[in-house]
Structures are given as structure tokens and as C-alpha cells.
Amino acid sequence: FKTGHSLIKARMKETHSPLGGEMSGHIFFKERWFGFDDGTYAGCRLLEILSRSADPSAVLNALPTSHSTPELNVTCAEGEPHRLTTELQALAAGTFAAPAQINTIDGLRVDWPDGFGLIRASNTTPVLVLRFEGHTPEALARIEAAMLALLHRVKPDAQVGSAAH
């Protein structure tokens, strides 16, 4: 589904999810809160959940490890991000073979067994937003290179920079 706090909250309501979040670190709770995200509250709720376990370290150690980029941006002209996203989506099927799985719900997301790449148009500014994740540093490097190669096919002058948050 698409990113953005209002869209995440709507999806949580639709699916009756008690918890939702984004890679940006925004975490939303359905119960015992006012529906907006708050880092301190999220941390306290995590501690509450961990306190119910006889071995909190085991709970955390059971979580998958991954390597990811920060949010990356490509500055574009007004209206360009959506056009570029459409072009990327059209090229993806001929570029990425199985076991890659292509998702075009919100930009272009390509999932591999060992990670994913995402390029999407920002909903608020004229930029492309990029995120890459791999189970290992090598997987991350391979996925990032593959996605950037595709991006440079539709925008050869793309300069990737870290998001200014």
C-alpha cells in the first residue's frame, strides 16, 4: 500500500490493525493513544511488550536483521516524478526476472528473496524517493545498483542525495 501517515492510518482502520508504521520511523497505535505517532510513546509501548516476555533479548534477537539505505531523494522538475515513475514501471517487467517480484501500487517496488528496492514519487515535493534494503551488505549493494541502473535509463542526469529531514 501507499506511504503517508493518513494512508497508513486509513489502512490500519480498514484491516483492524493494532499497529502500523513506515520505514521513516513513524509508528502508529490503534489503542490507548490519540492516533498520532510519538517516538517516546512508541518506545514505552515496545518496553511494555518486551516486559511480558521471560527473555526480552530473545524476542529482539528473533527479529530479522537487514541493511538499508537512508531515505534517498532525486530532485526533479514539477510533475516529473510521476512521469518517471510510470516509465520505470513500464521498464521493470523487461528488466527484472524471477525471483524478483514487481509491485506498482506506490511507485516501483521490486522484491527479491534477500531484500527490496523502492522508487516512488513523493506526495508532497517534486522528488523521487528511493529506499533499498538487503539481508546482507552484498545484497543491499546489488539491489541498489540494479535499481539505480534502471533509474538512469529514464533520468540519466539523476543525482541521488540523502533526504533533508
What are the roles of these predicted feature ranges?
Residues F1-R131, T136-H165:
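Phosphate-binding and adjacent anionic-ligand microenvironments
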